[in-house]
């Protein structure tokens, strides 16, 4: 049987007023019990977005483009004092990047915070974040990819619902913009994610009892395991979820709906990271359901020496006997739907849709 490889979607690869700096407050390192959930206030046109780089730096051109994108959404933009600082592949030292986050949460004139990009380095700054202060100054925090480490930290340590969504360097096309607004600005009681409006995306097809890679139709997601489940949405980038496993910032997946995306990792690496989350009884084996995004550019270069991505996903996840879908449009793809981290939702894998059960912002 002929197997097609995944066809990679393209990922999207001004001035502002500085504000007074605050010294970063180092975490006491205590493993906090799960804090009571806090849902931040919605964003509105005219609000001020704080733009920062908690991982890899932005170039001046990327910064200008990011500011323009946010202004086109109707926001005012203020970027962090350390925005254009570089330290190798990082956007400044760990303490500088943490300081930017702490002071943006503390600044009452900042209504929401968006990351300029991902890259690498978010996990390094977790010990320097003041989670008590952040909890007392809740506001939307938005990002994905390497920013998964911060989504874990904010939700687990401060109880703050945050948002796996586009960043400054993202492509604000119709779908990305629509779901950003539906989640963060114009919340609905039961927002449905089902790819109905999506142009062709990557998917998986079932043929002769096995999974085969295909181009999906505009309405297609793939059911790996049918069924329905409810739970809080948590998740993010698989590499970061794996990195955080066993740390004080890790999250229990018991009865959660776990969403996962990845980019540029070979099938054996996907296998290894999923296996790590399977070997812990409080991780994927305890989950209520799994929502997989598009695993962009994750097929083997030489498929004769490798399992396909499809085979890995089927082998590792089908045996859990919980609902699993593949292909929801989020992650390292152009049409990147915003997912609220910590909001209750219902997964209907048989019908290939995800529905929020509460408003994602207050």
PLM regions and their residue ranges:
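N-terminal export signals
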Residues: 5-27
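Oxyanion-binding "anion nests"
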Residues: 233-271
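C-terminal segment of N-terminal export signals and the immediately downstream linker at the start
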Residues: 21-58
């Amino acid at each position: 049987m002929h197997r097609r490889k995944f066809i990679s979607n393209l990922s999207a690869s001004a001035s502002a007023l500085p504000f007074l700096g605050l010294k970063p407050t180092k975490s006491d390192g205590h493993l906090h019990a799960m804090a009571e959930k806090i849902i931040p206030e919605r964003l509105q046109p005219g609000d001020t977005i704080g733009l920062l780089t908690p991982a890899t730096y932005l170039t001046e051109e990327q910064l200008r483009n990011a500011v323009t994108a946010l202004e086109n959404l109707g926001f005012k933009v203020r970027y962090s004092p350390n925005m254009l600082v570089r330290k190798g592949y990082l956007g400044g030292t760990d303490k500088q990047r943490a300081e930017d986050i702490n002071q943006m949460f503390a600044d009452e004139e900042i209504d929401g915070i968006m990351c300029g990009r991902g890259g690498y380095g978010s996990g390094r700054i977790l010990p320097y974040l003041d989670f008590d202060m952040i909890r007392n100054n809740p506001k939307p925090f938005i990002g994905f990819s390497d920013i998964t480490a911060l989504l874990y930290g904010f939700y687990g340590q401060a109880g703050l619902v945050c948002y796996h969504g586009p960043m400054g360097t993202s492509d604000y096309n119709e779908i990305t913009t629509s779901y950003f607004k539906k989640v963060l600005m114009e919340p609905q009681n039961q927002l449905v994610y089902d790819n109905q409006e999506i142009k062709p995306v990557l998917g998986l097809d079932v043929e002769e009892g096995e999974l085969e890679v295909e181009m999906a139709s505009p309405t297609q997601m793939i059911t790996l395991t049918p069924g329905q489940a409810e739970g809080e949405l948590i998740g993010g980038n698989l590499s970061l979820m794996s990195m955080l496993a066993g740390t004080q910032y890790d999250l229990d997946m018991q009865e959660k709906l776990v969403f996962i995306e990845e980019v540029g990792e070979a099938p054996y690496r996907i296998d290894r990271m999923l296996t790590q989350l399977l070997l812990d009884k409080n991780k994927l084996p305890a989950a209520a359901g799994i929502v997989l995004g598009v695993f962009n550019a994750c097929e083997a270069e030489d498929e004769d020496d490798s399992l396909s991505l499809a085979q890995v996903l089927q082998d590792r996840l089908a045996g859990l006997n919980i609902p699993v879908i593949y292909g929801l449009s989020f992650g390292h793809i152009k049409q990147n739907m915003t997912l609220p981290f910590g909001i209750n939702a219902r997964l209907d894998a048989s019908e290939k849709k995800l529905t929020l059960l509460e408003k994602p912002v207050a």
